[in-house]
Amino acid sequence: MKPVGEADVKGYNTWDTSAPIDASTPDVGTRGEPSLDAIVALHPDLVVTTTDLPENVIKQIAKKVPVLALRGSDGSDPIGYMRRTVTTLAKATGTEAKGTQVLADFDAKVDAAKADLEKAGKTGAPFTMADGWIDNGTVSVRMYTPGSFLGGIAEELGLKNQWTTGGDKDYGLATTDVEGLTKITDADTTFLYAASDDDGGDPFAVGLKDNKVWKQLPFVSAGNVKRIPDGIWMFGGPLSAERYVDAVVDALS
């Protein structure tokens, strides 16, 4: 189903190539500050947003057009919540059969990946997932706990997340720095991370290349740092999940 409008079309297509939006799709502003006038001008049947958008903004939009506001994720059950969200959106758009098929495809992908990991001797393998950014020369690191979308997918694959604490209640994300990574002591841990050459660059390969603490981390010394392909949205749905599954299998096997 093609949207009549989208917030931050360019940014979306930078970070999510699993389900790209037509670049000519009308842009209605940023995700945090959408333009009410731009939205209304498109005469949408339904506006879908997350409850991350301020409540007063959602109410303003709802005065003009129907709005479906969904929680971005649920740190207590990220994959279950993804499933429920797909079902909710399918019902709202009259595409129930498609929604069922999308979830079935995801399940099949997970089953195949678990078999591939077993063949590679990687069932239950230790891993972490991260992204990061550079601010005034300092690298901040965001860790994906089991309550995160990507952490939940890896758990479905039977992998063992080595960063289990500090996640927020919605997205399961925890923030640390390079010194904090010293808590990861198992050299067999695969340190997966996301970055974008088009938005922020690579804080690990570039920002930490000369950092002594980073270079002495067991998993770094062992060569177990793997960047996942660009364009896998870290807070997405089944299509992003399937691409992440492929990325994990490739990285570990």
Regions found by a protein language model. Give the residues of each.
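Extracytoplasmic ligand-binding site segments that recognize negatively charged/polar headgroups
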Residues: G11-T14, P54-N56, G72-T88, K122-G152, ...
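Hydrophobic beta-strand scaffold residues
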Residues: P3, V67-L68, N161
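Extracytoplasmic substrate-binding proteins
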Residues: P66-N136, G231, F235, L239-S253
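Alpha-helical, coiled-coil/dimerization segments enriched in small aliphatic residues
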Residues: K10, S140-L173
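Short helix-initiation/N-cap motifs at beta->coil->alpha
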Residues: V28-L36, D168-V178
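Structured C-terminal subdomain patch of bacterial secreted/periplasmic proteins
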Residues: T185-S253
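A short, structured surface patch at a secondary-structure boundary
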Residues: M1-A38, T51
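Proline-aspartate-enriched helix->loop->beta-strand connector
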Residues: H43-T49, L181, D186-T190
